[in-house]
From Swiss-Prot:
Keyword Glycoprotein in record: yes
Effect of residue 2 to S: In strain: Isolate IBV-EP3 and Isolate Vero cell-adapted p65
Sorted UniProt keywords: Glycoprotein, Host Golgi apparatus, Host membrane, Membrane, Transmembrane, Transmembrane helix, Viral envelope protein, Viral matrix protein, Virion
Segments in the Intravirion topological domain: 42-51, 99-225
Protein name: Membrane protein
UniProt subcellular location: Virion membrane; Host Golgi apparatus membrane
PROSITE patterns xref list: COV_M (PS51927)
Virion surface-facing ranges: 1-20, 73-77
GO MF term (any one): structural constituent of virion
Record text on subunit structure and interactions: Homomultimer. Interacts with envelope E protein in the budding compartment of the host cell, which is located between endoplasmic reticulum and the Golgi complex. Forms a complex with HE and S proteins. Interacts with nucleocapsid N protein. This interaction probably participates in RNA packaging into the virus.
Entry function: Component of the viral envelope that plays a central role in virus morphogenesis and assembly via its interactions with other viral proteins.
Xref: CDD domains: gammaCoV_M
Organism whose genome encodes this protein: Avian infectious bronchitis virus (strain Beaudette) (IBV)
Length: 225
């Protein structure tokens, strides 16, 4: 009979393996902690992009581990649990792509594939430029500001513009809805009276429909910049 090799690690081998790779494990966990804790669109777009890549990798990694668990189950109960968890992971991953593609068709923004949220804010400036930004939910009020000639919304840098470039309506899109916000108040000028230096706009949620942003674009340069 052929010799069978036992590939199971005993306690001492496990400790030795951990000692050899503990520095790598520490560095890897520290990297994940920094990315997940400090990866915000309002702080650093580079770290936020790395965070998105890490989150995107979690689902395929989870599915791969689930397939391995199904291939090498510890027992019958473990096989059933592995199948259920793997199917759930696959359905969740497919559902994410379906919702993201639907949102992309509505607003034509790569923010649609943001795994942290299911909504994208869009401001169609009167000069034809479209500014998209990540938003976690659909709020009742949005307050974009212009500071030193730069437009910000939800704390995110969007574009250089003038107060006159802000439209009457802005939008927050979800996979199945387009939420329309109407400008209800506008404050311009700072303490020095410079109206181009600082401006605050208040938009209140006005209505909801199923339209796409393309249907409200009129002239100007490319809508999807």
């Amino acid at each position: 009979m052929p010799n069978e090799t036992n590939c199971t690690l005993d306690f001492e081998q496990s400790v030795q393996l951990f000692k050899e790779y503990n520095l790598f494990i520490t560095a890897f966990l520290l990297f994940l902690t920094i990315i997940l804790q400090y990866g915000y669109a309002t702080r650093s777009k580079v770290i936020y992009t790395l965070k998105m890549i890490v989150l995107w990798c979690f689902w395929p990694l989870n599915i791969a581990v689930g397939v391995i668990s199904c291939t090498y189950p510890p027992n019958t109960g473990g096989l059933v649990a592995a199948i259920i968890l793997t199917v759930f992971a696959c359905l969740s991953f497919v559902g994410y792509w379906i919702q993201s593609i639907r949102l992309f068709k509505r607003c034509r923004s790569w923010w649609s594939f943001n795994p942290e949220s299911n909504a994208v804010g869009s401001i169609l400036l009167t000069n034809g430029q479209q500014c998209n930004f990540a938003i976690e939910s659909v709020p009742m009020v949005l307050s974009p500001i212009i500071k030193n000639g730069v437009l910000y919304c939800e704390g995110q840098w969007l574009a250089k513009c003038e107060p006159d470039h802000l439209p009457k309506d802005i939008f927050v899109c979800t996979p199945d809805r387009r939420n329309i916000y109407r400008m209800v108040q506008k404050y311009t000028g700072d303490q020095s009276g410079n109206k181009k230096r600082f401006a605050t706009f208040v938009y209140a949620k006005q209505s909801v429909d199923t339209g796409e942003l393309e249907s409200v674009a009129t002239g100007g340069s490319s809508l999807y910049t």
